[in-house]
């Protein structure tokens, strides 16, 4: 859930780690790849050795062997894998995302539709957003994922990231557009509920409170037990406060006591409204 400062919500954040593949999944992926590739072509023993070295945490030894694989196989699937693993080592193990980006870009240059293309493009997008904080480039890279890889299960993830980035850039109107695109193109997405909640937040941020309240009304009918209920109640109360409906706003804020995740902010709201009502009884 997002905190709010001075009544305005903080930037949209995914509650899913953008680099959630994790070491266990990476290691599992390495050995699954061995199984698959062994059915179609002979695996260079050096490639297997390099992967084993990385799994064991011997990063520099793995790098040396992967580079030897590239000398022996300057093109083809094994070269693509060597470049891809070099990118992963530098990104995850050596915390050198700039160097990792070079390897990942080489993978795409070698074969944009190869077996490592999609995860490579995901890494590039994530590095642009979270590592380099180059938000304009990150939007381009996430859009590339949507345009070039028709993965319905993850397309909504990429669309959500685009909306989130526009919010980070404080381009709230475009964030609203992107959230609506998500709902239109991926109506059954696991992001649908959260996106509808974020739309309410964005409308409030844009001081479009009547629209925010209308969206809130539809939301509560559709998601009666939403995990965002307290956050939405806070937004609606904030709208009422901004519009001068102080008693109603106060009552809504008061009802959140013991339930809202940020009690200090809630207390600040209540005290502020109490002071306003004393000045203007």
Give residue ranges: language-model regions.
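Sec-dependent bacterial lipoprotein signal peptides
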Residues: 1-37
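Acidic, polar-rich low-complexity tracts and alpha-helical solenoid repeat scaffolds
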Residues: 3-4, 9, 35-281
């Amino acid at each position: 859930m997002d905190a709010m400062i001075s009544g305005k919500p903080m930037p949209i954040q995914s509650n899913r780690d953008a680099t959630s593949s994790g070491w266990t999944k990476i290691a599992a992926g390495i050995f699954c790849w061995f199984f698959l590739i062994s059915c179609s072509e002979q695996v260079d023993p050096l490639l297997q050795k390099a992967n084993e070295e990385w799994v064991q945490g011997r990063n520099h030894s793995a790098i040396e062997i992967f580079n030897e694989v590239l000398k022996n196989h300057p093109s083809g699937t094994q070269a693509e894998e060597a470049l891809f693993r070099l990118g992963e080592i530098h990104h995850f193990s050596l915390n050198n995302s700039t160097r990792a980006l070079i390897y990942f870009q080489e993978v795409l240059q070698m074969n944009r539709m190869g077996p490592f293309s999609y995860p490579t493009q995901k890494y590039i997008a994530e590095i642009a957003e979270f590592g380099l904080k180059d938000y304009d480039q990150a939007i381009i890279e996430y859009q590339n994922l949507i345009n070039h890889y028709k993965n319905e299960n993850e397309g909504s993830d990429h669309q959500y990231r685009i909306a989130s980035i526009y919010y980070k850039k404080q381009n709230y109107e475009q964030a609203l557009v992107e959230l609506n695109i998500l709902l239109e193109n991926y109506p059954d997405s696991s992001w649908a509920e959260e996106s509808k909640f974020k739309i309410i937040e964005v409308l409030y941020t844009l001081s479009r409170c009547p629209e925010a309240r209308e969206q809130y009304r539809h939301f509560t009918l559709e998601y009666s037990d939403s995990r965002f209920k307290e956050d939405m109640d806070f937004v609606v109360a904030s709208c009422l406060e901004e519009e001068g409906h102080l008693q109603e706003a106060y009552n809504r804020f008061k009802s959140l006591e013991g339930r809202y995740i940020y009690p200090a902010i809630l207390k600040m709201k209540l005290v502020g409204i109490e002071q306003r009502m004393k000045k203007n009884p």
